[in-house]
């Protein structure tokens, strides 16, 4: 069991957190592990795991690692993963695990087989259903024998209308995608890069999907921009964990960049590029995606240091607009699904079982922000500043509120402090 704990610590813990948090973890455990202060950065994940196994023989230091991850908002999902792995080793959730193996993977199949066992085989049930439908259709046709031709025509028309209804139903479901990909407003987002027609954008998007490797981070309708664009970095957050569509825990960070005429919010899914996203640094990006005004950079994108001749001068008005926050009264008027970024003052905090309600307020009004997952009960209090990244507007019973999504991030600035050092590297 001890070896299992060490495996979790090393493979599911230390190897999955970035260098910054690993350095922070080593600093906090320096005394327990007798780490030399001058050589802390030289210790590898394997060496730390070996030391933890010796220092904490009961669980190889897994408990310490979980406590650390729980205290760091960006690593709370990692803490949940580690606790689940630990419970599986101790056998606390063996029944739950067996239920999950039989359930979530094939819920529809299981249900259909249960029904089939009560009523006969699934295929037979389907045949009975189609027979009943055919009988109903025959009865309807027989109500007016003299108008058989008209009835047939109406039947064909009805079938066409049903097909159209199915297509419309599918089309209505198509926009269901991560909240951060919804339509933004001009008040809090930069304009779209190209003003080409939607038809040409769809054609370009279709070509890009064929030529580019599949990437689940790319939202539907995103447009690939292969030509280089030189920008100046304004801000960048620390990397944080998020859950991908494949239910894998990955890392990303948010940034804001600007050209000579506009600014953009950026989602960066390759944290190896973090060093390039430093304040006032000039970079040239290419092979990036644009979706509703938000730029997305992944592993296939190119980010290079800009040459001296490529340096640009960003007007002060662009920088001011990029750093400005939308008024809450304007947020309340927004359309459901609209994405918002901004810094707001926390007025009230109410912790619930599944989520936390953060009421933010400015001179124009107040609005509720709902935080769940790793943004549930974050370390903040009234008067603190909450810097919200990629929160989308939702309406419940006519009341607007901001809700977190897969790519949402919250940066807390304590009351009395001008700015946290990790906001901009």
UniProtKB/Swiss-Prot annotation:
It is found in: Nucleus. InterPro entries: DAPIN (IPR004020), DEATH-like_dom_sf (IPR011029), HIN-200 (IPR040205), HIN200/IF120x (IPR004021), NA-bd_OB-fold (IPR012340). Residues 122-153, 190-206 have a biased composition (Low complexity). Mononuclear phagocytes. Residues 1-88 form the Pyrin domain. Sequence repeats lie at residues 129-135, 136-142, 143-149, 150-156. Signal peptide: none annotated. Transmembrane segments: none annotated. Induction: By lipopolysaccharides (LPS). Residues 213-413 form the HIN-200 domain. The keyword Nucleus applies. Residues 207-218 have a biased composition (Polar residues). The keyword Repeat applies. GO terms for cellular component: nuclear periphery; nuclear speck; nucleus. Its main location: nucleus. Residues 129-177 are annotated as: 4 X 7 AA tandem repeats of T-S-T-A-Q-A-[GR]. PROSITE patterns: DAPIN (PS50824), HIN_200 (PS50834). One of its GO terms (biological process) is cellular response to interferon-beta. Residues 86-223 are annotated as: Disordered. Keywords: Nucleus, Repeat, Transcription, Transcription regulation. Residues 86-99, 159-176 have a biased composition (Basic and acidic residues). PANTHER family: INTERFERON-INDUCIBLE PROTEIN AIM2 FAMILY MEMBER (PTHR12200), PYRIN AND HIN DOMAIN-CONTAINING PROTEIN 1 (PTHR12200:SF25). Interacts with HOXB2. Belongs to the HIN-200 family. Inhibits cell growth via p53/TP53 and RB1-dependent and independent pathways. May work in synergy with TP53 to promote the transcription of CDKN1A/P21. This is Interferon-activable protein 211. The gene is Ifi211.
